[in-house]
Every structure is written in C-alpha cells, then in structure tokens.
Amino acid sequence: MLSEALLVSAPGKVILHGEHAVVHGKVALAAALNLRTFLLLRPQSNGKVSVNLPNIGIKQVWDVGMLQRLDTSFLEQGDVSVPTLEQLEKLKKMGDLPRDRAGNEGMALLAFLYLYLAICRKQRTLPSLDMVVWSELPPGAGLGSSAAYSVCLAAALLTACEEVSNPLKDGVSVSRWPEEDLKSINKWAFEGERVIHGNPSGVDNAVSTWGGALRFQQGTMSSLKSLPSLQILLTNTKVPRSTKALVAAVRSRLTKFPEIVAPLLTSIDAISLECERVLGEMVAAPVPEQYLVLEELIDMNQHHLNALGVGHNSLDQLCQVTAAHGLHSKLTGAGGGGCGITLLKPGLEQATVEAAKQALTSCGFDCWETSIGAPGVSTHSAAAVGDPVRQALGL
C-alpha cells in the first residue's frame, strides 16, 4: 500500500485534423498537448479520504469507515466494471455527494469515488488518502481536461494499491509505466470518462495515457510512430458551444446536400493523411518546405470546417489576427467557438509571437505558447515540477 507521496501528471489533447469528419468514418489525428494535469496523492492515518480540486473550488472529505460500509456489490472483483446510470445515482446518494455540486464539478467527485472504490476494493481495508489535483488545462474547452483527470486518478490509485508498479526509482526525476501497466491505466481511465461523459470515444484518455499522437478511424486507434517537435499557440476564444449540437448540424447538412458535403469530408480525410505523411517525413530532418505544407493544410482544413458550418466569428477573428502576423490557424475540436491552434515554425521571431499573443488577448481570448507530442501519463519527483505546480499542490 502507498507509504509515501505519489505525484503523477497527464497531458491534454488537441485535434490536429479530422474533427467532424471522424464521425463519418474518416481519419482524425490527435496529439498530446504539453499542458498537464497534476495529481498529488499522500497516505493518511486519520481514517479520512480527502479530495481537493482548487481549480474548480471543490474540497470533499469522506470517512473511510463510512465508505467501507457502502454496498459496492456492483463492482465485480477483478474486472474493469462498466458503471450504469442507476449504479452511479446510487453511488451519489451513498457517497453523500453535496447536492449543490452539479455538472462537471459533481462528476469529478463521482469519478473519484467510483474509481477509488472499484480499484481499492481488493484491499482488506480501504486506504486513507489525501488527494490534490491541479491543472494547467482550462475545463470545458475541448482540450481533454476530464480525460487527463481520469488518467491521473487511474494511475495514482492503481499504483497506490499496487495493481501496477511505481516506475519512479531513487535519483530519477520523471518516469513512465511499462506498456502493460499503461493499458490497465487506460482501461480504468476510460471508466472514469464514462462516469463524467456517459459515452466517450476513448480518444482523449488514450492520448493522455500514451502521449505523442494518435490516428483514429472508425473506433480503431494507432500511435504515430514518432512525431517531430511542433510548437503551437493555443487560443481559447472562451465562446461556449455544444459538441452534440455541432455534430448534429454537420449530419443534417450532409443529409441535405450529400453531393456537396460528402466530398468535403473526403477532402478533410485527405488533409489528415497528407499531414500524417509529412509529419512522418519530418522526424528525421525537417526542412522549411515541410512547415509550409503544414501551414497550407491548416488553412485548407479551416476553410473546409467553415463550409461544414462549424466555424464561428470568434474563430474567424483568431485566424485573421494571426494571419496579420504571418501565422496560420485553425479551430481544434468541435468548433463553434472553443479553441484554435496556430503553428509556430522554427526561426520565428519571438517578437512576432508576442505581438500575436497581445493582439489575441486584446480580443478577450486566452493564449498559451506550448508544444504538441507531449509524453503521456508520468510520475515525478517533487523537484521535477515547476514552482507554480508545487505551490498549487502544497509541496
């Protein structure tokens, strides 16, 4: 059982190409974003389980004895169990979750409670733990924040209960789990995502578990063997949108104009495949011409997405502002607001990037200069993370 503090992190994700087309059987490329969620798990001896999520202002404490007495017969011994709505409603009541915690806040607590009971149930007595989670990812922006949370939960609880080994050895600052353990972490993280979202695709938790980049088509995922280091500007327009409504709108447009929209989806598929090919070539020795191709693909895909009807004035503004500084941008995810990505090719003057960031910020947007192809779920020594993370986690 856990005898000392455990610090884990997992990345968010962006869709490079293929959003919306993937719903219709086309290829999508998703990459791990180097903005991460961090989880600190400490053993306690006070008979309590405490969860602190400072990003969203949640602190919850349970008595281990009360949790021990819960009827968890629906959690089948030894298997990754699929929660039903009835079971989750029962768990909400049994776990005494605050009624004023609605939406994603309540779901975050419920996901913890579900995974804690499901993973730790083999222990003779449930462990007394203190958990703090802090994220660099904005919630609800389509960047995989809930998946990063679920992956951190799964990795930390499985390690604490010795279902997977702790890969961090003395003198090592960062380490990752072996492949078999990553598969187990991903399976449990997917169940956490089920609790939060009901019917997730599994893409977000897979990207957060393995990192790098994934190719996704018709339910089949495969890892891009390698990915060149790509710097991006990530912009959150902060315009809320409904993924479900946008997906339905594209489907409606396809039904109404099949001979127009079907070729658009086929063309987006070709953009994804061309991007995959170019990225593969860039791994060995990238040349300037390849970045120009990536920029062209970004521009073409953005126009295609506008033609599908998933653009937004805020995203047009993002593209226009960055274009004024010689940069190329597209929406990422569902569209209709949300986030966009801008490629920052090597050799770009920092003054240009800063000017673009300032212009975007003056539009009311949030910006991060970051990279894609980040490592997946990892465990760290306290010294390996930056001061803001240590401060947020109370290290």
UniProtKB/Swiss-Prot annotation:
InterPro entries the record matches: GHMP_kinase_C_dom (IPR013750), GHMP_kinase_C_sf (IPR036554), GHMP_kinase_N_dom (IPR006204), GHMP_knse_ATP-bd_CS (IPR006203), Mev_gal_kin (IPR006205), Ribosomal_Su5_D2-typ_SF (IPR020568), Ribsml_uS5_D2-typ_fold_subgr (IPR014721)
Principal localisation: cytoplasm
Enzyme class, first EC level, given as a word: transferase
Keyword Cell membrane appears in the UniProt entry: no
Catalytic activity, as annotated: (R)-mevalonate + ATP = (R)-5-phosphomevalonate + ADP + H(+)
Molecular function via GO: ATP binding; identical protein binding; magnesium ion binding; mevalonate kinase activity
One Pfam family matching this protein: GHMP_kinases_C
EC number: 2.7.1.36
UniProt keyword terms in alphabetical order: ATP-binding, Cholesterol biosynthesis, Cholesterol metabolism, Cytoplasm, Kinase, Lipid biosynthesis, Lipid metabolism, Magnesium, Metal-binding, Nucleotide-binding, Peroxisome, Steroid biosynthesis, Steroid metabolism, Sterol biosynthesis, Sterol metabolism, Transferase
Biological process, per Gene Ontology: cholesterol biosynthetic process; isopentenyl diphosphate biosynthetic process, mevalonate pathway; negative regulation of inflammatory response
Enzyme active site: S146, D204
Residue sites binding ATP per the record: K13, N55, N104, S135, G140, A141, G142, L143, G144, S145, S146
Record flagged with keyword Kinase: yes
Protein origin, superkingdom: Eukaryota
Subunit annotation: Homodimer.
The protein, known as: Mevalonate kinase
Source species of the chain: Mus musculus (Mouse)
Lineage, uppermost ranks: Eukaryota, Metazoa, Chordata, Craniata, Vertebrata
